[in-house]
Each structure stands twice: as structure tokens, then as C-alpha cells.
């Protein structure tokens, strides 16, 4: 995932990595470590798909160039909510990376979307 971020943006153009809870956090931690960048978390809630908020216990995203990391993209609702939350907090979302993209989408809310694996029905 860090290699994808480097190929798409270059290490110097990434300030903060955002991991979507729960499964995206471990991937985001490793990407942030490799990139030597800050990290924060988008915490999902039980209120329904796509609900959640940015954690205030980690790095802030205001004025930062952000890469979002998650494990699986299915409907894209949680990723869209994450993008909206980062933008509302003053961050610039440059790229979204997932381990498995279960859609045919290559962007989401005008943000490039990259998946290490694409799994769609044929």
C-alpha cells in the first residue's frame, strides 16, 4: 500500500494517513510508518453503514495532504463519509487505497481509488 501511495503521489506529498476502523487501522499504521507521516483514525459507529467521525486522539488533518487506507471497499459509503469528514476538517484527500476493491470504481468523490485486489462478479 505504501508503494502504491509513492507511485501515485510520491512520499513527500503525503502528510497524514487515515485508517478506517477497525481493519484499516493496522494497514494505515504500517503505511504511515513507512512514509514517516502522521496517522489518524476514522472511527465507524453502529448507527449504520457510512456513519462515523475522525478521532481527536491522533494527528489532525487540517491543512494536510491525506491518504485514506481501508481493508475492503464494498458500497463505498464509509469511504465517502471519511472523505467528507476529512474535507470538513480542512484536509485535502489525495488518494484512497484499499486491500480489496469489490467495485469497478477507480475514484470516489473525485478522489483516486486504488485497490491491491479487485474482486467483482463477472
Where are these regions (language model features)?
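Conserved acidic residues
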Residues: 15, 64, 94
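Active-site-facing substrate-recognition patch
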Residues: 1-9, 13
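PRPP-dependent phosphoribosyltransferase catalytic core
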Residues: 83-122
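Solvent-exposed alpha-helices and their adjacent loops that cap or buttress functional pockets
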Residues: 10-11, 58-62, 88-89, 106
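Short, glycine/charge-rich flexible loops or terminal/linker lids adjacent to PRPP-binding catalytic cores
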Residues: 27-67, 77
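A contiguous pocket-lining binding segment that forms or flanks enzyme active sites
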Residues: 61-91
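Short glycine-rich phosphate-binding loop at a beta-alpha junction
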Residues: 11-21
Amino acid at each position: 500500500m505504501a508503494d502504491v501511495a509513492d507511485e501515485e503521489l510520491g512520499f513527500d506529498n503525503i502528510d497524514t494517513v487515515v485508517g478506517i476502523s477497525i481493519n484499516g487501522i493496522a494497514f494505515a499504521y504500517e503505511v504511515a510508518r513507512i512514509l514517516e507521516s502522521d496517522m489518524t483514525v476514522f472511527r465507524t459507529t453502529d448507527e449504520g453503514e457510512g456513519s462515523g467521525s475522525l478521532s481527536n486522539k491522533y494527528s489532525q488533518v487540517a491543512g494536510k495532504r491525506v491518504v485514506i487506507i481501508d481493508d475492503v471497499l464494498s458500497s463505498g459509503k464509509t469511504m465517502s463519509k471519511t472523505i467528507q469528514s476529512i474535507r470538513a476538517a480542512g484536509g485535502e484527500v489525495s488518494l484512497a487505497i484499499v486491500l480489496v476493491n469489490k467495485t469497478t470504481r477507480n475514484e470516489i468523490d473525485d478522489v483516486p481509488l486504488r485497490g491491491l485486489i479487485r474482486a467483482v462478479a463477472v
